[in-house]
Each structure stands twice: as structure tokens, then as C-alpha cells.
């Protein structure tokens, strides 16, 4: 669980066969009882904050929520006569609508052109791959020597191909004991293409508390939580594999990893001037024309990435680091203990380099022997 700025505040371990939505109740109790929060807004993805969880857990608890609709629900909104029509995006990429299916709630519909292009490209790639595989099956059915025969055998081969890329909805299939034919379904493809790049953010918060832009920004801030989860599991802390076999030890292991990430999160913010990390999130957000648009690095971050140097500090600019390379640099600092005579010990610290001195300064640390 993370705060709005991405700072981790709590972690809990569940049995491996527990579905994500079923973990919600305990987290609400934690927020209210342990943290004594009176007003809580839960921001979660469409897999966690499902309609069932909203109706059974969040609404009775009087909580606010921000989540997104699944593809079938978006398709219903876009049906003939529905509130979600292409004309909404003639001169904007975000609009607010309502629907009787979501009483007392606000729906913010967004269209991201870059996401639309990517989905169209991926669909074309999947269609082409599926068509090639189906053509090979058709050739097996039509060949003179040892042809593929039997509706069941042909259907099994076709099902494997369609299931691999999940493209069954976009093909019309005809199978008999000794024939097989297929064709793309243009109506299905066109209907899906019409919704490319469109997503719908759902909330019960009043406009005075969170307008459309703030609601979209809050939902997109989930990327920070996802980054924290990835950092714990893989690239940074490598939580797995877990070499523990009892529940208390597994929980202790996960808690220590979360505390390590908490420390890393604060260190990265303090060391941002020396890292490739974004130093000025407010400037990055201010240059966006819309919260739907892709976030670009701030001018300061772009200069830092281009020059591979920090802003001038005490003379020449310093090299820009990743978090890991900077830690590696700091790890070269040594503390040497010298024995003088039999009983006298003297500790001597290595003299920090300019890079190390600046890092320690940003962290508010003063090395002592």
C-alpha cells in the first residue's frame, strides 16, 4: 500500500490462492483502525476495485474510490445511443459523462492517440500471425498426402491457434470432416478499433473534491505503486526467491524488503539532483497539455540526460548516476583502523570524492570515525 506520492506505508502477505479483490476488506480496516483515517479514497486498478467489491465493501464503508471500467463495460457505454460516442473526442482527449448504470458516479472518458496507435499495431500483428497459422492448417486439410481429417481434429488444431493469440472473435470459421475455411470478421475488427486508446475512469468523488483532470491523474498515479511492486519483486530488492518455510518468517522477510524500499524511496528523492530521476515533477506535469497525454521529462531532466552531468555544484558539474551506480561509488568509502603500539587504535576515514561529498550532503549525513 502506497500513499498518493508513491511512498510505501504498509505491506501484507496473503495466501497464494487469494484473489486480489478479496484482500480489500482487510486494507480498509487497516486504514481506519491502524492509521485512524477519517476520509479515505481508494485508487485501484480494474482488477482490484471490481463492481462487486465497490458494492459490497467500499460503498457500505462510505469510502471514495477511483478505478477504471473493464472492456465489456466500455463497449456497453459505446453501444448505439450510449453516452460514449466518437464525437466526444473531436476537439479534446477527455470528457465527463454519466450513465444510469452507474448512479451517483462520474465517468471520465479518455482517448490516448499513442495508445490507440499501439493497440492498432498490435492487433494487426496478431491478426497476421493468426491468419498465417490458420493458412497452414488449411494447407494440411487440402494436401493430397496424409491430409488432416475429422472435424474434431481440425477443430482442435484451429482452437489451439485461436487460443494462442486470443483472436477467435475476429475470425469466421467453417469446419467439416474434410474442409476448413476461414476469413477475418471486418465488423468485429472495426468495432474493436473504434475503441482503441479509450479508457474510462470511474469515481464517486464530487467535482469539488476531484475534477476530471485530477481524477485521471490520481488513477494514472497507480504506475508509482506498480513501480514499487516491481522494485520489490525484481530489479531492485529481488524479494524472490523466498528461502523461508514458515508464515512468520515469510512475513518478516517481506516486511524487511518493504522497509528497504521505504529507505530507497526517500534516498532517491534526496539524491534526485545527482540521478537520472526526475527532480521536478511539478515542472514535468505543468508542461503537459492534458493529464491524458504522455508525461515528458522536465527541461532540467532532459538537460541532465543529454549532458550526463549535473547542474554546476562547487565548480565543474558532476557525473549523473543511476541509483545503483551511485551506491556503488559510495561503497568505496572506507574506514581504516590503525594500531599504534599495543593498545592504541586510531580510526581514519577515507577522504570523500566530490561526488561522494555531494551525495552525503544531499542525504544530510556527516561521516564520523
Question: Residues of each region from the PLM?
Answer:
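Anion-binding and metal-coordination hotspots
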Residues: 1-369
Amino acid at each position: 500500500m502506497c500513499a498518493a506520492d508513491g511512498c510505501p506505508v504498509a505491506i501484507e502477505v496473503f495466501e497464494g490462492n487469494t484473489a486480489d479483490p478479496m484482500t480489500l476488506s482487510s486494507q480498509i480496516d487497516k486504514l481506519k483502525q491502524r492509521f485512524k483515517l477519517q476520509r479515505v479514497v481508494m485508487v485501484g486498478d480494474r482488477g482490484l476495485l471490481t463492481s462487486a467489491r465497490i458494492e459490497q465493501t467500499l460503498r457500505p464503508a462510505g469510502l471514495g474510490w477511483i478505478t477504471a471500467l473493464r472492456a465489456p463495460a466500455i463497449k456497453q457505454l459505446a453501444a448505439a445511443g450510449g453516452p460514449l460516442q466518437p464525437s466526444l473526442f473531436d476537439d479534446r482527449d477527455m470528457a465527463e459523462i454519466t450513465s444510469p448504470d452507474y448512479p451517483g458516479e462520474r465517468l471520465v472518458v479518455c482517448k490516448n492517440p499513442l495508445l490507440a496507435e499501439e493497440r492498432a499495431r498490435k492487433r494487426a500483428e496478431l491478426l497476421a500471425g493468426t491468419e498465417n497459422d490458420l493458412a497452414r492448417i488449411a494447407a494440411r486439410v487440402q494436401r493430397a498426402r496424409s491430409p488432416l481429417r475429422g472435424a474434431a481434429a481440425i477443430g482442435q488444431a484451429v482452437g489451439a491457434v485461436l487460443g494462442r493469440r486470443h483472436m477467435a472473435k475476429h475470425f469466421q470459421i467453417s469446419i467439416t470432416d474434410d474442409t476448413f475455411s476461414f476469413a477475418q470478421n471486418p465488423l468485429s475488427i472495426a468495432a474493436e478499433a473504434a475503441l482503441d486508446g479509450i479508457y474510462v475512469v470511474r469515481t464517486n468523488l464530487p467535482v469539488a473534491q476531484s475534477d476530471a483532470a485530477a481524477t485521471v491523474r490520481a488513477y494514472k498515479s497507480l504506475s508509482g505503486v506498480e513501480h514499487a511492486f516491481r522494485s520489490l519483486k525484481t530489479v531492485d530488492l529481488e524479494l524472490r526467491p523466498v528461502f523461508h518455510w514458515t508464515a512468520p518468517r515469510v512475513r518478516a522477510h517481506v516486511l524487511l524488503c518493504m522497509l528497504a524500499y521505504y529507505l530507497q524511496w526517500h534516498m532517491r528523492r534526496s539524491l534526485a539532483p545527482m540521478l537520472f530521476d526526475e527532480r521536478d515533477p511539478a515542472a514535468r506535469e505543468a508542461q503537459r497539455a492534458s493529464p491524458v497525454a504522455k508525461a515528458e521529462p522536465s527541461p532540467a531532466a532532459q538537460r541532465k540526460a543529454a549532458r550526463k552531468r549535473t547542474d554546476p555544484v562547487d565548480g565543474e558539474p558532476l557525473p549523473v548516476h543511476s541509483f545503483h551506480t551511485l551506491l556503488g561509488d559510495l561503497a568505496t568509502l572506507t574506514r581504516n583502523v590503525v594500531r599504534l603500539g599495543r593498545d592504541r587504535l586510531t580510526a581514519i576515514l577515507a577522504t570523500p570524492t566530490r561526488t561522494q561529498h555531494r551525495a552525503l550532503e544531499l542525504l544530510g549525513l556527516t561521516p564520523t570515525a
